[in-house]
Amino acid sequence: MRKVAILVAIVAAGLAGAWWFDLPARLGFAREPRQAVLYGNVDIRQVSLGFRVSGRIAELRVDEGDSVKAGDVIAKLDAEPFRQAVGAAEAEAEVTRATLAKLRAGARAAEIAQARATHEERLAELENAKLAFERAKQLRPNGTISQAELDQANASRAAADARARSAREALVLLEEGNRAEDIAAAAAQANAATAKADSARISLEDTQLAAPSDGVILSRVRETGAIVSPADIVYVLSLTEPVWVRAYVAEPDLGRVHPGMKVTITSDTAPDRIYEGTVGFISPVAEFTPKSVETPELRTDLVYRLRIVIANPGKDLRQGMPVTVHLPEAKEAS
């Protein structure tokens, strides 16, 4: 009987101990290691493409659903008006460069020699005019010549003197060369004409529309023959690389997430396929949970936005698709 009592006491003590140690868990004070789950969507990354110049669309090379690579030419404008503009701008630039070169080179040696000869000729004419005036002045007192003839001789001397001074100034200008201000003005005109030609060439290059990155054509907005301006959209491109997931983490779980952390992602479309991802960005600003996020928590909770970069996403993850982000297991203190 005594042995039975001892056995009953041992069993009762064991049950009491089990109940005691299980009490915190039943009261919610202790939790088992768990795997946190976040909810989000594959980020929508699109770019609207258009020409930087106005013109008529001559060719559209891709259609909706076509895949393109960065640098692929997907549309062209009629380039003939732009080629003509380039030709005119280059000709104008060549004229201004020639004018500048002429000013910098100054007068040729033959031109200076000719100006010097002209000056010497004008000096000789001036000397003859002076002699004629002196003779007329001596003849006038005795009445050999009239006053009108004396005045004519004086006028001829003054005209010869003016021609000699003009020839001298022309020679000095040629010998000294062009003014620095004139050369600077010509240089500025040449630079402006060169810049205009460069701009015309850039406009010619802009008649081709190239894909800025790899992607899939989402929309073809215009058709061949349409007249477009720089504000008009021709294509909408969906960017396929890299694939980002936009997810949200509540403030109590924020300490479990850090940039560079590895996570796994699943989708409702292929729940058995697991994608590997890396947390690349955590927003420093809290926001309310977006209405598009499927979450069991209250939508009025403040959350922090995450950007997760998917490695080897394949073609199953499409933009806007809802996904589930699984964080690594973490033990929480009781």
UniProtKB/Swiss-Prot annotation:
Localisation: Periplasm
UniProt-listed InterPro entries: CusB_D23 (IPR032317), UPF0194_membrane_YbhG (IPR022936), UPF0194_transport (IPR050465)
Pfam assignment, any one: HlyD_D23
Coiled coil: 101-208
Keyword Signal listed: yes
Domain of life: Bacteria
PANTHER family per UniProt: EFFLUX SYSTEM COMPONENT YKNX-RELATED, UPF0194 MEMBRANE PROTEIN YBHG
Protein name: UPF0194 membrane protein RB0873
